[in-house]
């Protein structure tokens, strides 16, 4: 939801940078309207004008579209960079996993002990809770 709000705010800001928001002229004729035979040539001109007005609208808004596209590309690049940095940092932190074995003693006491005792340089204070069912 915050992304949608951010996108709307960005569009509003971009419109304010380029000036007042422009309203598009309605060049469409009603669907049930009939043209007299002498106006058939002007119907072709109306269609050309409608296409021309759409293109002029796109061309008028081209700087805004360009600014939004550049912003989205920069944001995507930043996100990808952050993910790559996070992956590189986590790859450095991966340590050799210690494997544990179950040692059973009388009176149902169970404890965990490392299998390889030669790597006891670290003070390992991991506690294991065993629950009996």
Curated annotation (Swiss-Prot):
Membrane topology: Single-pass type I membrane protein
GO BP terms, alphabetized: Golgi organization
CC annotations in GO: Golgi apparatus; plasma membrane
Residues that carry a glycan: 32, 45, 67
Membrane topology, Extracellular segments: 20-67
PANTHER family in UniProt: EXPRESSED PROTEIN, MEMBRANE PROTEIN FAM174B
Protein name (database record): Membrane protein FAM174B
Upper classification of the organism: Eukaryota, Metazoa, Chordata, Craniata, Vertebrata
Gene that this polypeptide is encoded by: Fam174b
């Amino acid at each position: 939801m915050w992304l949608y709000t951010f996108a709307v705010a960005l569009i509003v800001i971009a419109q304010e940078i380029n000036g007042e928001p422009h309203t598009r002229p309605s060049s469409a004729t009603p669907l049930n309207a009939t043209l007299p035979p002498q106006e058939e040539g002007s119907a072709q001109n109306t269609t050309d004008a409608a296409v021309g007005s759409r293109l002029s609208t796109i061309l008028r808004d081209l700087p805004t579209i360009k600014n939004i596209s550049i912003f989205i590309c920069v944001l995507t690049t930043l996100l990808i960079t952050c993910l790559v940095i996070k992956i590189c940092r986590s790859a450095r932190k991966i340590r050799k996993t210690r494997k544990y074995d179950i040692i059973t003693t009388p009176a149902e006491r169970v404890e965990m002990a490392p299998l390889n005792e030669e790597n006891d340089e670290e003070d390992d204070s991991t506690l294991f809770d065993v629950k009996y069912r």
